[in-house]
From Swiss-Prot:
A single Gene Ontology CC term: ribonucleoprotein complex
Gene3D superfamilies linked: 6.20.340.10
UniProt-recorded name of the protein: Large ribosomal subunit protein eL34
Key words of the record: Ribonucleoprotein, Ribosomal protein
HAMAP family, alphabetized: Ribosomal_eL34
Family according to the record: Belongs to the eukaryotic ribosomal protein eL34 family.
Organism placement in taxonomy: Archaea, Thermoproteota, Thermoprotei, Desulfurococcales, Desulfurococcaceae
UniProt GO BP: translation
Species for this entry: Staphylothermus marinus (strain ATCC 43588 / DSM 3639 / JCM 9404 / F1)
InterPro entries the UniProt entry points to: Ribosomal_eL34, Ribosomal_eL34_C_sf, Ribosomal_eL34_CS, Ribosomal_L34e_arc-type
A molecular function GO annotation: structural constituent of ribosome
Length: 92
């Protein structure tokens, strides 16, 4: 019988076979949804779907791409944004 705190669907059930041959259920937090672009809403590549405690253990470069606005804006929107800003600075 699970503890009352584990009788919720907000936890993921993982079936694990123990060395003794029994199958037991481990309760883990669910993965969060993918990080999305702030402009177009497309899921971002290079940003892991991890809970904050596991994300904290990653190196800085494993958390998001190494480019301006990496982990916040997708490359397509970034290139469009840079083109617009350069054109605006040239015209004025």
């Amino acid at each position: 019988m699970p503890r009352p705190g584990l009788k919720t669907r907000s936890k993921r059930r993982v079936y694990v076979r123990t060395p003794g041959g029994k199958v037991v259920i481990h309760y883990e937090p669910r993965k969060p949804g993918p990080a999305r672009c702030a402009i177009c809403g497309k899921p971002l590549n290079g940003v892991p779907r991890l809970i904050p405690s596991k994300l904290r253990k990653l190196a800085k470069t494993e958390k998001r791409p190494e480019r301006p606005y990496g982990g916040y804006i997708c490359p397509r929107c970034l290139s469009r944004l840079l083109r617009e800003s350069i054109r605006a600075s040239i015209s004025s």
